[in-house]
Amino acid sequence: MASKGEEKPELVGSKQGIVSVTKAKHDQIVLVLRVVAFLATASATIVMGLNQETKTLLVGTIGTTPIRATLKAKFQHTPAFVFFVVANGLASVYNLVMLGVDVFGRKLDCKGLRLVIISILDMVIVAVVAAGASSAAFMAELGKNGNSHAKWNKICDKFESFCHQGGGALIPSFIALLLLFLISAISIITLHNQKLTSPHATTP
């Protein structure tokens, strides 16, 4: 009976050691994913934020005299693109702050709520970036193909550079969305493992 009682603390200690090693690997993976996600969302924000094109187009004729107008396409003209820039910019700031927390603030854990708060915030950022990327992708498709039922004409045949740059901003945003989803999943798994190895979860 005494030998069984002595084996149990060793088993618990070895289990906690394995979990601590796994958590360290998870922290390293999350750190790398956050760096790449930050670069992706920052790239998407900058590329879309600088997206504009000016063209002089033929809008009509009077007799044989052509009438031309200079038009400018800017991301600010489309609310979906504005939201895209805000969403990716917010995700960039969030990832930058979380990088600082991961590197310098690991000891700051108020009553064990650090992982809970981070997991919730990760899910919120995933939702925000998903909304921004999907709304911008919808408007990009509308600009490329138009909508014959609603009588909305396409514009990408006139503003090619604007559409290409907008499409280029969507790519890193969707890459960041995938990375943020992975980060959120790892955060939840880490939180779950922490609960399993907490003193309250161990049986006497």
UniProtKB/Swiss-Prot annotation:
Name of the protein described by the UniProt record: CASP-like protein 1B2
Family note: Belongs to the Casparian strip membrane proteins (CASP) family.
Keywords: Cell membrane, Membrane, Transmembrane, Transmembrane helix
Record organism: Vitis vinifera (Grape)
One family name in Pfam for this protein: CASP_dom
Residue intervals on the Extracellular side: 50-80, 136-168
Assembly: Homodimer and heterodimers.
KW Thylakoid (keyword) present: no
InterPro entries: CASP/CASPL (IPR006459), CASP_dom (IPR006702), CASPL (IPR044173)
